[in-house]
């Protein structure tokens, strides 16, 4: 090869330097001067023989060669012609060719030549006059489209101030009444107890009613102006004759910009005070989108640089075999794709976790408020202690060692009285211990003094066992039950299910 290999960046720099396409674009301060024209590099499946690549590299730059003129035959002639030829109807595009070396492999890159903007200055000068006529036509058409807004008002609320825009009438700044009490939320209603200001009025003929608005005798270019910014065009109307400004002594004025927005209804986007008593309002409207002159700029054309592998005749067989292998691997991978959608690492609908025999989801039970299920875990009746077996405890997911520890604690607190250890399930599950009271104590509870004694006993029990959600269960921590909230029963200290018994603690699981 006679030309030195270049990297991808060199191709892009060369393509940009050889093109004057940016000259067609109007200047915008937000544009990237090095971003136009735009290129992308593509590596299609295919190759070109070394002898044929040499012929492209040795020819004159910026030419449009025909592969049929090359006498040497290649095995994949159709593929090469499809890549090198331009896809346009009957016309051959101009290309330059460069050799690229990437990861030890040589490529022949075809760079499209973008037409230079300075090649036909006469045509550009002629188009300037046509452009002026087009701008005048677009201005007239824009005013015609906006005329549909006559008799309608738009509103905009910004903090204390609200604004009304009534086309062909005026723009007003006022304070709105708070909504409620018969005052609608929209449109905002003016509070006549505060000052309001007219920011600008549309020009009207003499003697015409100000509230109805009318067309002025001025030309369309005096009423409106078509401006271009960033490739998009919008209509501008400058309104004067507003209320007098206290600071400057001049009348207020406002500039209104109408922008095409096909996804929006007529609305005020924002309004700001550029300087004292001079304002700028931007309005989005789909009406202007009916004229192509106001449509948003289209996406810039991206030119494709195609790079194909350069092979010797001896390397063609190996390349074809590798290409066929890659195609077969793609077919295998597509066949192995999961039939069900995978979300969060779980194949939805595969029934790997539930849905088959032995993997059923237990139906939930809707428990109403106050509905509880009580099962006896252990109890002491007439001095005899009865406990559930280890297998039965496992059904309730209870630890045998913990139950034994709670049993000893109940024995200590009961002081020889009968007691019951229950597991209560409902909206959650917890253990509850109940100590039976003596008959004499039951009789004592009926009088006033007994109520006082029982209340004191209940308070002492709370100090010992603690309340739910409160830290510091000293006895509970010593017995290995730290972290399980404790509380008392109802205020009278009686269990509705067990007559003559007193609840000692409640241990949530």
From Swiss-Prot:
Enumerate the residues binding a mannooligosaccharide derivative: 160-161, 173, 246, 252, 273, 279
- Predominant subcellular localization, coarse grouping: endoplasmic reticulum
Biased amino acid composition, Polar residues = 64-74
One GO cellular component term: endoplasmic reticulum membrane
**Entry keyword set:** Disulfide bond, Endoplasmic reticulum, Glycoprotein, Lectin, Membrane, Signal
- Which residues pair up as cystines? 153-166, 245-277, 260-289
Q: Does the keyword 4Fe-4S apply?
A: no
Membrane topology of the entry: Peripheral membrane protein
SUPFAM superfamilies registered for this protein in UniProt: Mannose 6-phosphate receptor domain
Annotated GO biological process: endoplasmic reticulum unfolded protein response; retrograde protein transport, ER to cytosol
**MRH domain ranges (all copies):** 151-291
UniProt key word Signal: yes
- GO molecular function annotation: carbohydrate binding
Q: Which InterPro entries match?
A: Man6P_isomerase_rcpt-bd_dom_sf (IPR009011), MRH_dom (IPR044865), OS-9-like (IPR045149), OS9-like_dom (IPR012913)
Residues with glycosylation annotation: 120
The Swiss-Prot or TrEMBL record describes its family as follows: Belongs to the OS-9 family.
Give the protein's function.
Lectin involved in the quality control of the secretory pathway. As a member of the endoplasmic reticulum-associated degradation lumenal (ERAD-L) surveillance system, targets misfolded endoplasmic reticulum lumenal glycoproteins for degradation.
Q: Which PANTHER family match?
A: ENDOPLASMIC RETICULUM LECTIN 1, OS-9-RELATED
Q: What is this protein called?
A: Protein OS-9 homolog
Organism, scientific name = Emericella nidulans (strain FGSC A4 / ATCC 38163 / CBS 112.46 / NRRL 194 / M139)
